[in-house]
Amino acid sequence: MEPRSSERQRGASRPGGYRTEHALAVDASARIPGFRPEPPRSLEELALPFSFVAELVLKIMYFNGNILGRDIAARACLPWSITSDALNFLASEGYCGTTGIRGTAGPGADFAESLQYLVTSLGRERARELLELNQYAGPAPVHLDDYLESARSLVDEAPTVARDQLREALSHLVVPDELVDILGTALTSRQALFLYGPPGNGKSSIAEACAGVLGDPIFIPHALYVHGEVIRLFDPVHHRPVSGPPLTHDQRWVLVYRPVIHAGGELRGNELELAFDRSLGFYEAPLQLKANGGIFHVDDFGRQMIPPRQILNRLIVPLESGIDYLNVARAGTTVSVPYATMLVLSTNLDPGELIDEAFLRRVRYKAHVPDPSADQFRLIFERVCRSQGLAHSSRAVEYLLERHYHPTGRPLRGCHPRDLVGQLVATARYLGVPPELSPDLIDRVCRAYFSDIRPSSTAHVGGNARTLN
């Protein structure tokens, strides 16, 4: 299919895509961001080659059989005027035809929206040729230039984080005041943050909660168009759409809450680069790009399959310059994109054995997440009991501390109340007795939870870093 001479040529005409359906809507409590993509009124505003659009529409029809015109437009997330042009072109080439009408067009709608379209045998042959190149058949991608405009607005319009706002976001956690203030200044500056300290004290929960103060929901594209290639950006695993009444906007974009992208010990080096899926024929965005506008949290730092230095070397340039460089190998080019995410590293290993001085300087904020004090432990225990519908007993908590902590010098961990109460409820259910903080149930749970196993300080660690106790 040859592009029209009047089309806006920004890149080679190459097919791409994946299948998805997404209705965009807004939670009544969520504020609409300043950047709001308007629906394209023409092919020029769409900024995609006409041949790409026509090929995308053909693949959508191929995968869906007999399909209404308006449903094709909805799946492609395109206005009917642009979809109609593509359908007329495909029909003139003998790739599709109409099989009848179903329903009626709404007020002001085009009659052709209610027509049913079906791919011809010639069209199926052409679609299979296109699918050998790539199998993308989802929402039309957004041109990289249009995405860059939105990403820059994330940097330019970053709001200041107020102390009361942060305290509210962390209200479900027990966090020392000094730590709250370090978090607040780091979030306001959007500079990298290193959380370190013993395991089980809420470093991951803190990172998750911090995303709530980064600002209003943001629009992100389903996918990007870069030099004829498609990069899938919206990820239902990591991005949470805002729900509510539908918005009038460019449907190629999704309104999502500020993302928190977690990467733990399973993180691999290729997840920080554009990943080309040979079976599908298009790219998957790297994790840090998916995290733009939110937080990229590398949890259990130092326990990945790749050395800490490799992760740091990959991210050091974006941290320093605010620009990330992505290699689009199939197009033979490298593109630059704004690095508009806040990097949060968390570990229970000794940071001094993981990071050299040069990188430590670039991670501007370092915060120690300590074990809770005895009073904080009691408060956490009370909150957990309340959340589990369990009657709280101060005397039972003192029994727990005196019997199972003080004699052995066992450290208090923020996760212990949740874990112990959860196991106590399960134990009571198994025994057929009421769940209560009785000495017998507490002793049973502690015998199962605590053990004589001495954890290794370097097990599954990329190096010989010490575990913090």
Regions found by a protein language model. Give the residues of each.
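Short regulatory helix/loop adjacent to the ATP-binding pocket of P-loop NTPases
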Residues: 350-362
